[in-house]
A protein has these predicted regions:
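Catalytic cores of carbohydrate-active enzymes across secretory and cytosolic contexts
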Residues: 1-241
Length: 241
């Protein structure tokens, strides 16, 4: 884990990378103080809570209490066909852009564009990173090993650029991603269906809150909508910190 000045330098570089990707994709003016939020892990659409993360970001678009722009990233490896050449060219130019690319939600092409769960859910919800959307969502469907052709940073370097990580698991025996987030000084949201969430609650003696560094949500088979709202509300609250 980087410390001191090295941590600050790496966090700044990661934020710059993420904000530049968002601008190059969407053509929107992404503010320097935009709140960067992400979820990551294996591509298990329901078990990892990717579905409810997308739903929460969709609801956040219409939340009037939101104090900042939000750029949300889904970082899960899919059936990747390779980096988008036109996106790579924009990033290599070092310029800022005011027009979007086609499909301004996706960093790498997929072999299964018509069948991908994330893309289909974004289409259903009408989440296409329109100019007036205060919440942008970017799908990064590749392993972050530092040579993906777009971000070109490892996961552990990139996670430093986040302001908040969200792991709303439906099933997770332990959950290393939230543990790694807080190890890198990034607050996170998880659930009590993850072992890490249960541990955080046990340590506090009550449900852990975002002010503690880990927000633990109660999740059951029947409260999907409530979990989506709780994520939305926590991100909106965090935007005012």
């Amino acid at each position: 884990m980087p410390k001191g000045g090295t941590f600050t330098k790496k966090r700044k570089a990661a934020r710059r990378c993420l904000l530049d990707v968002a601008n190059a994709l969407t053509g929107d003016d992404i503010q320097e103080d935009a709140l960067i939020v992400s979820t990551s892990g294996r591509y298990e659409f329901r078990n990892k809570g990717i579905d409810v993360f997308i739903e929460a970001m969709n609801r956040l678009r219409f939340d009037e209490s939101l104090q900042k722009q939000v750029v949300a990233f889904i970082e899960v490896p899919g059936c990747t066909a390779g980096p988008r050449q036109e996106l790579a060219e924009r990033l290599d130019s070092g310029r800022q852009f005011d027009t979007p690319l086609d499909m301004p939600v996706l960093t790498h092409w997929l072999h299964n564009m018509d069948d991908d769960n994330v893309l289909n859910r974004l289409r259903t919800l009408g989440m296409n990173n329109a100019k007036d959307d205060r919440v942008k969502l970017v799908f990064v469907p590749c392993y972050l090993t530092g040579d993906d052709g777009i971000l070109n940073m490892s996961y552990y370097d990139l996670v430093l650029g986040n302001d908040l990580c969200v792991y709303p698991s439906y099933y997770e025996p332990w959950g290393y991603t939230p543990l790694e987030a807080i190890a890198f000084k990034v607050p996170c949201i998880t659930t009590d269906l993850a072992g890490f969430g249960l541990w955080a609650n046990t340590e506090k003696g009550a449900y852990s809150e975002i002010e503690d560094g880990v927000k633990v949500l109660h999740r059951t088979d029947y409260n999907y909508s409530e979990v989506a709202d709780a994520i939305k509300d926590t991100v909106a609250k965090y935007s005012a910190f």
